[in-house]
């Protein structure tokens, strides 16, 4: 019983992938403030390694990377993990970009810098609480 209570109180781990150092630092602080443990990755290869290790409550992906893109990363994660929620948090704001992210297997797509909807969307995807948003 104590192990079950301890597990339910443990901070959920969120993988955040972005090749911009300032964004990674900001997300580290925000996720900690929101009560989550951030697993930060600067590259697609680091992100895949963290995702394959498991134990994540959510993956937050940027759309564009120097070496690849978040759409391909989302597909690669979905190839071995169909359960962990994925959301995009990106400056790529065209409708086509958003649709590609959702088609690749993400449940949500927020356009940076949408801080008003970031925490509610994270909470909704992890806990199933809060208003559904796609911005």
Please state what every model-predicted region is:
Residues 1-13, 117-135:
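Non-catalytic signal-transmission and effector/linker regions of two-component phosphorelay proteins
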Residues 40-58:
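Acidic, metal-coordinating helix/loop segments flanking the phosphotransfer/catalytic sites
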Residues 71-82:
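Short amphipathic alpha-helix used as the core "switch/output" element in two-component signaling
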Residues 11-22, 27-31, 59:
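Conserved acidic segment of CheY-like receiver
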Residues 43, 69-72:
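Acidic catalytic/metal-coordinating carboxylates
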Residues 72, 93-111, 115-120:
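Alpha4 helix (beta4-alpha4-beta5 surface) of REC/receiver domains from two-component response regulators
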């Amino acid at each position: 019983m104590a192990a079950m209570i301890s597990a339910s109180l443990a901070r959920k781990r969120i993988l955040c992938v972005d090749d911009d150092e300032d964004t990674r630092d900001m997300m580290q602080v925000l996720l900690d403030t929101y009560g989550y443990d951030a697993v930060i990755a600067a590259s697609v290869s680091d992100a895949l390694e963290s995702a394959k290790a498991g134990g994540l409550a959510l993956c937050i992906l940027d759309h564009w990377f120097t070496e690849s893109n978040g759409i391909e990363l989302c597909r690669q994660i979905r190839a071995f993990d169909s359960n962990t929620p994925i959301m995009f948090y990106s400056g790529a704001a065209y409708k086509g970009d958003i649709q590609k992210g959702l088609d690749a297997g993400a449940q949500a797509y927020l356009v940076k810098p949408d801080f008003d909807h970031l925490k509610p969307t994270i909470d909704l995807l992890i806990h199933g609480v809060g208003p559904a948003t796609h911005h």
